[in-house]
A protein has these predicted regions:
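Beta/coil-rich, acidic/histidine-enriched accessory regions frequently appended to metallopeptidases
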Residues: 2-103, 107-112, 138
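Beta-propeller blade-edge and WD-like acidic-aromatic loop motif
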Residues: 34-40, 74-96, 119-120, 124-147, ...
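Repeated loop/turn-to-beta-strand initiation elements of outer-membrane beta-barrel proteins
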Residues: 89, 188, 378-383, 407-414, ...
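Transmembrane beta-strands of outer-membrane beta-barrel pores
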Residues: 216, 359-362, 376, 387-391, ...
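C-terminal outer-membrane beta-barrel translocator/porin domains of Gram-negative envelope proteins
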Residues: 427-430, 472-613, 617-619, 625-628, ...
Length: 682
């Protein structure tokens, strides 16, 4: 309790402490901030208050200085936008994070670079297991060329040569960060450096000399102090003294401009002979930047109003000049090889979480539940256990024991379980209560970040207690052996908020069969979902699902459908065939509801307009979609309104539904079907 702690230790309330601390910060830093220009830029390209997003980075100005490209998260994805130099025209060129060959844009090491003619730009994205160098049209975003770099662990910071025939980049391989030059026509990858020093930020001058930042020196055990180096095609020479940490590098009129720490923030300095000319004076730091061919237009990414924003400077003027020697206060760190003994890793488990509860009932006696999770130090092995039990009958307890092997690209799941379920028997002649004791093994193989194959096999031993439909026990018990096979495929590139997906798509298709049993059947099913976000909090959501059970005992293993709102409390549809269609328009309903009594505040209540339709049926029933008069025949449908309030782990959902056959309401308008429950958006 922070308030009680403050009262006891400092003898002041939280409110008084907050006020005094705020005054102390102002007294300490306001005089310091007066030495900086808070808003010295000329044009602000991005603004989180208008566009949304908090991370706008890697701006690159075209050689002509008339436009720029940058990476932004304004749509919650990492996208590449083009903008006029005034910021009035902006357009999305590349959508990131939604397909296997554009998994991510390496936001912590991102760089975009225009070709010399300004018609194209280069960028790097993560593909399915390797990095890809892209060249795209700077006005349409069309991908013109893509070069996978499967021989390297990663690539960063692409930079066009003045003739547009080569691209310099940083390549990562076996723990090394080295400079490479990629020849576009021949696809030859030329290695410029080959050592354990860190080489970053390659860029060309107009004569074709390659500049980059590096901590290379005569002692391989010293690192962390950077200088600018120049490669003329034959040899590498140091162009500046060591200057500590260099945060970025670009060229202006064939002179290096570096982002350096100065007075506890990061500003830009142009290297001119033996001098450093400071050309920015911001308090919050500049993290990446670029110049046009003339050097008169500069785009930069800086911290502004709580976000990383892109701004434009027009002909940035010198702020002051420092002797380069007086600035070289960086120091090397010395790596000292350590003596160690190598031992083979042994798997050892420790408990990560444990939860449980217990109680006593005069009807059942002692009862409780327990769940716990254990893993090894590397996270490659997991064991998860969950159970409930009743003291009077431990043999009928429910439990699940899972072992997860996560070391390889493919994952394995071994499971042993016992649980109870409700089913059917002898073509729906009886209702069954089944005790399922069994085990299974599943293998998961991800093709990429979005697509996965699942395959498995298992065995269930069912003890089936048969009941009549009125709930009377028949006295009959059936024992069934069910070995099964399973195959599934899933796709998911949806963007998730805490309460559910808001953009993208999800799809799953699976098949399961019991080939050798007294309960033989085969099942196929699919579920596809698509989300269209038309504005930040306004979403159209659609879902279509369906399936079919085949085989001798198809009627004993039906689908049970309850996803048609308005009908789910009044009827349960089951059969060996089913389909469900759900559609919603989701929107903010109440941003804040403040009640006088009880004194509570409900924040961000969301709303949705929905239409649902679906049904499940047996082959013997027959199925007809429409009646002769155009109304629904077999399917059931409803429309209505839904309100949702997220409480941290689930939504409290209130549905108001009117049932319809598409010609008329099946319920009076004033008597809809209400449902109140916990859940999440599909």
């Amino acid at each position: 309790d922070i308030e009680a702690t403050l009262e006891k230790t400092l003898h002041m309330s939280l409110e008084d402490f907050s006020r005094d601390f705020s005054l102390w910060l102002k007294e300490k830093y306001y005089p310091y901030l007066s030495d900086f220009d808070i808003e010295e830029y000329d044009i602000q390209i991005t603004d989180r208050r208008k566009h949304g997003g908090y991370f706008n980075i890697a701006p690159d100005v075209s050689p002509a200085g008339d436009m720029l490209v940058f990476i932004t998260d304004r749509n919650d994805y990492s996208d590449i936008y083009v903008s006029s130099i005034t910021g009035r025209f902006q357009k999305k060129l590349i959508s990131g994070n939604t397909r296997p060959d554009l998994e991510n844009l390496h936001l912590l090491n991102a760089k975009l670079d225009f070709s010399p003619d300004g018609g194209r730009f280069a960028f790097v994205a993560r593909g399915p297991g390797y990095d890809i160098l892209y060249i795209a049209d700077s006005r349409t975003g069309k991908i013109e060329k893509k070069f996978p770099f499967k021989g390297l662990d990663g690539i960063r910071y692409p930079a066009f040569s003045p003739d547009g025939r080569r691209i310099a980049l940083v390549g990562l391989k076996d723990g090394k960060s080295d400079i490479y030059i990629f020849h576009l026509k021949s696809r030859h990858l030329e290695r410029v450096t080959d050592d354990y020093f860190t080489d970053i930020y390659p860029t060309f001058d107009s004569r074709g000399n390659l500049y980059f930042a590096s901590d290379r020196n005569e002692d391989i055990h010293r690192y962390g102090n950077y200088a600018i180096f120049r490669y003329d095609g034959a040899s590498i020479e140091r162009a500046t003294p060591y200057m500590g940490k260099i945060h970025y590098l670009d060229m202006r009129n064939d002179e290096p401009v570096v982002a350096l720490e100065y007075r506890n923030t990061i500003n830009l300095f142009q290297v001119k002979g033996e001098k450093l000319i400071r050309i920015t004076n911001v308090a919050t730091g500049i993290h990446s930047f670029s110049f046009d061919r003339s050097g008169d237009v500069m785009a930069a990414s800086m911290q502004l109003n709580g976000a990383r924003e892109v701004v434009v400077y027009e002909n940035p003027e010198p702020v002051d000049t420092l002797p380069i020697d007086s600035f070289t206060r960086g120091k090397f760190y010395h790596y000292r090889p350590m003596e160690y003994v190598s031992r083979k890793y042994k798997v050892s488990f420790s408990v990560d979480w444990i939860a449980g509860a217990g109680g006593y009932s005069t009807l059942y006696g002692g009862m409780g539940y327990l769940t716990l999770g254990m893993s090894d130090w590397t996270g490659d092995h997991w064991i998860i256990f969950s159970s409930d039990m009743y003291a009077q009958d431990i043999s009928n307890m429910q439990f699940f024991i899972d072992y997860l092997y996560l070391k390889k690209r493919w994952d394995a799941n071994l499971n042993v379980h016992q649980y109870w379920s409700i089913g059917f028997y002898d073509s729906l002649s009886y209702i069954t209560f089944d005790k399922n004791l069994g085990a299974y093994m599943l293998l998961y193989y991800p093709f990429n970040r979005f697509d996965r194959l699942e395959i498995g096999t298992g065995y269930d031993y069912k003890t089936r207690y048969l009941y009549y439909w009125d709930g009377t026990y028949t006295g009959i018990t059936v024992f069934q052996h069910e070995p099964f096979l399973y195959l599934g495929f899933s796709h998911d590139n949806a963007l998730y908020y805490p309460w559910g997906p808001v953009n993208g798509s999800r799809f799953f298709a699976g098949a399961q069969g019991v080939p050798i049993s007294t309960n033989r059947y085969a099942m196929v099913y699919a579920d596809g979902r698509k989300y269209f976000r038309i504005a930040r909090n306004y979403v159209f959501a659609f879902r279509l699902a369906g399936g079919r059970v085949f085989g001798e005992h198809a009627y004993d293993n039906p689908f049970i459908v309850g996803d048609v709102r308005g009908w789910n409390r009044n009827a349960v549809f089951f059969g060996n065939n089913f389909f469900v269609w759900n559609s919603e328009f989701r929107f903010p309903f109440i941003k804040e509801l403040v009640l006088g009594f009880p004194p509570i505040t409900l924040s961000y209540i969301r709303g949705a307009l929905f239409f649902d339709m679906g049904y499940a049926w047996f082959d013997s029933e027959g199925f007809r979609f429409f009646s002769p008069d155009g109304s629904l025949a077999s399917p059931k449908a409803a429309f209505g309104f839904s309100a949702r309030w997220f409480i941290g782990f689930a939504d409290v959902i209130l549905d108001v539904a009117w049932r319809t056959n598409l010609r008329e309401l099946l319920d009076p308008l004033k008597k809809p079907v209400y449902s109140l429950y916990f859940g999440l958006e599909y």
